Amino acid sequence: MKQKSWLFDFVLLGIVWGCSFIFIKLGLEFLTPAGVAFGRVFLGATTLLLIARVKNISLPKGLRTWFILWVVSLLLNVIPGFLFAYAETKVTSILAGIINACTPFATLIFIFLLSKDEKPKSFQIQGLLIGALGVGVVLGIWSGLGSGSTSGVIALFFAISCYGLSFPIIKRFLMPLNLKPESLAAGQLTSGAITLLPFFIIHGINKYDARPIAYAGMLALGIFGSGVAYIWNFRIVAAAGSAIASSVTYLTPVVAVLVGWIFLGEKITWNEPIGALIVIFGAALAQGRFKSSKQLA
């Protein structure tokens, strides 16, 4: 795939994932946090199942494989899906988007904790410390948590911790299966949708008379943010490598800040964009973006 082709997917992915936080806000106009979590996973699963059907890709087989997919869905979709939606009843979509950019730090921490072979390198420790500083600036720790809700902020950090824990598990248990990415993603989201269905039935809908834009936002969150986005991500990995694909995490907080400010009129405090830049720099450093191949070895 030529650079222009993967670059188009890269920009689309950054925009869609960056807009996910405003889509969550819109979904909360008529759904509960559990309803938002179920809606995005159900719509994403339906989208991926249709894509798999068109491409004649079969779903994974075997109880062990489905159990692993269920565990991954808990960590990537069910728990963080609920926590992000709950958090956005307390904090702005801008803050949620910025904290989400801390996911690489959580991933590194869990890799160090769970792997006996991987030891932290000096540049990774430096990146983690710089990232922690950036988070402190974003939250305005010199004045408590600024205007942020304590429970909302805690929920955000629990959510990205789930993301961080999921990646070592995926690498250890799912990657060796050598299944097609579309098959894994469809199975993962299907497991998540089944898990969340009872919570949606019990208390998933707050009201039925929401604005049309709220329904549109929920559709976009599920179909694109949790469905088609997986396909874009796989295409970028195949065409440009995982390093380029993971760089989209630097674009999403920028998009989240801009759309939250422009379309929702959310207030941006001076420390949030500055802290976000520090977080992005720390994440890039921790991922070895500024190191030569010799230094990474």
Q: Where on the chain are the PLM-derived regions?
A:
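Juxtamembrane helix-entry segments on the extracytoplasmic side of multipass membrane proteins
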Residues: 2-6, 29-34, 38, 61-67, ...
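Juxtamembrane helix-loop-helix junctions in multi-pass membrane proteins
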Residues: 15-45, 92-95, 165-191, 205
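Specific transmembrane alpha-helical segments of multi-pass solute transporters/efflux pumps
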Residues: 15-16, 20-24, 49-100, 136-137, ...
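Membrane-interface helix-cap regions at the ends of transmembrane helices
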Residues: 19, 23-26, 30, 44-62, ...
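Specific alpha-helical transmembrane segments that line the substrate/conduction pathway
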Residues: 35-46, 75-76, 84-123, 242-262
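Helix-helix packing/entry segments at the starts of transmembrane helices
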Residues: 38-39, 96-102, 169-193, 223-262
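Hydrophobic transmembrane alpha-helices of multi-pass small-molecule transport proteins
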Residues: 48, 70, 102, 109-110, ...
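Transmembrane alpha-helical segments that form core, pore/gating elements
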Residues: 107-109, 145-203
